[in-house]
Each structure stands twice: as structure tokens, then as C-alpha cells.
Amino acid sequence: MPTINQLVRKGREKGEQKSTAPALKSCPQKRGVCTRVYTTTPKKPNSALRKIARVRLTNGIEVTAYIPGIGHNLQEHSVVLIRGGRVKDLPGVRYHIIRGTLDASGVQKRNQGRSKYGTKRPKKK
């Protein structure tokens, strides 16, 4: 335990904070091209076919990104925008594709949480 005088002289050393989305290089989003679109299964207690894409970013880094929502129109060579945010039950998936921008269409027939899935407001009848 240091004395007050030692703390005044030296101070505490701050630990370096590690980025959770290093491929974005401190940018909020990055554009990229899908190199492969496929499904994979999640970790142990869960069971599903999660839709993911391998994306080559404009800075040359290739990452794995999750495609949120029900149904998508992405295929190889689709241009997408990605953001940070991992998927807890998919190891190695640290990014999300933003729906409703570039080639990624919004989720069809979605009424709640539309802004997160790039869906326009439905027309009133």
C-alpha cells in the first residue's frame, strides 16, 4: 500500500483499454463488401441457424458480421455498412450489419423497433 506522499509523486498507472471492435479503427461504422454469406450454429445451450457474412472492409481487414432480423437479401459482392457489437453465442462475431443502408434492405413487415432494422413506417389505411 503506497503512502500519500508516494501517490503524490508517482500517481496511479491507468490500464490501457482494449477496443471491442478493432477493425473499425475508432470509426462508428465502416463500409465493406460481402465475400461469403452463410449460416452457423450458436454455442452450447442455444440452437438455431444464425445468418452471418464475411465482410472485407474498405481498410482491407476481413471480419465476420451478424445479419440481424428475419430474412435478408444479402449475397456475395453486396456492399454493406457494419457497426461494432458482438453476438454472445457466436464466437468470433464482433460486428453487426446495419439493415436499411446500402445493399442491405430493411426487415419486411416489422412494426416495433423499426429503426434498428431499417424499416420504413407503414402507411395508414
Swiss-Prot record:
Claim: rRNA-binding is one of the keywords in the record: yes
GO cellular component, one term: small ribosomal subunit
InterPro entries: NA-bd_OB-fold (IPR012340), Ribosomal_uS12 (IPR006032), Ribosomal_uS12_bac (IPR005679)
CDD domains named in the record: Ribosomal_S12
Entries under Pfam families matching the protein: Ribosom_S12_S23
Biased segments, Basic residues type: 111-125
3-methylthioaspartic acid modified-residue sites: 89
Keyword field contains Protein transport: no
UniProt xrefs under NCBIfam families: rpsL_bact (TIGR00981)
Function: With S4 and S5 plays an important role in translational accuracy. Interacts with and stabilizes bases of the 16S rRNA that are involved in tRNA selection in the A site and with the mRNA backbone. Located at the interface of the 30S and 50S subunits, it traverses the body of the 30S subunit contacting proteins on the other side and probably holding the rRNA structure together. The combined cluster of proteins S8, S12 and S17 appears to hold together the shoulder and platform of the 30S subunit.
Subunit structure: Part of the 30S ribosomal subunit. Contacts proteins S8 and S17. May interact with IF1 in the 30S initiation complex.
Family, per entry: Belongs to the universal ribosomal protein uS12 family.
Protein name: Small ribosomal subunit protein uS12
Protein species of origin: Syntrophomonas wolfei subsp. wolfei (strain DSM 2245B / Goettingen)
Classification lineage: Bacteria, Bacillati, Bacillota, Clostridia, Eubacteriales
